[in-house]
Amino acid sequence: MMDKEVVYIAELDADVDDVVAAHYLHNKGVLKCVVLDPYPKTKEGLERKERLESLGVTVLKKMPPIAKYVFVGGALTLVADYIRMHHIDWLVMNGGFVGTNIATYELDKFKGKETVRTFNFNCDVNATDTVLKADERHIGHIMLVGKNVCHDIRNTQSGIWNGDEYKELFSKYHVKEEKRLHDMLACHEGIAYINGEDTFCEYDVVKPYNEGLCGTMTKWGSTKTRTTPYREVLAAVGYKKS
């Protein structure tokens, strides 16, 4: 269904999460290319870039001419620019937050919170602002897998990632047992949802909102009732009961 059509936007400096997610997409046979946004500055980030290239992955500094499915583990700077003249069918992103006003299950660290800071959104808040306001002519669907599910203990090797097919990938990158696999979760969910397969999470239609743009300190949440300048998105609200 999505044979080598996923453009993955990666931030390779922060930790191993993005490179594992990119490798996962490559293993699944759905990866078209990796676009670096922001471009890595650290030794580790540049090594991760070389590692992807050694797998035969195309690694770019800018968006390719056609990007039907865009999965995001980095910033939205290049996407915001791209959609001025191009269309994306599905934008799937590790980002955002569904809080106490909507989520039935809350993690202790977010109990009672409706908004939190979220890394990928805040890499470039103006770009995020643009993307979340884009209409269907520019982006057909937006799917957000946010902090409320990413930080869950289930998002680890002892939880949903305990299958044999993941072991080799995790050992290759020395992924710790308790490491939350934020970007890999978003990638898995995007592939599964678009292909009509089983997702790990439950989804609901919400609108993102913030408490005012404030650079990297911007706090984001989701709403079904309040007025917001942003469009409706599909957001992960919790894990399915197993």
PLM regions with names:
Residues 2-242:
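N-terminal acidic, glycine/proline-rich low-complexity segments
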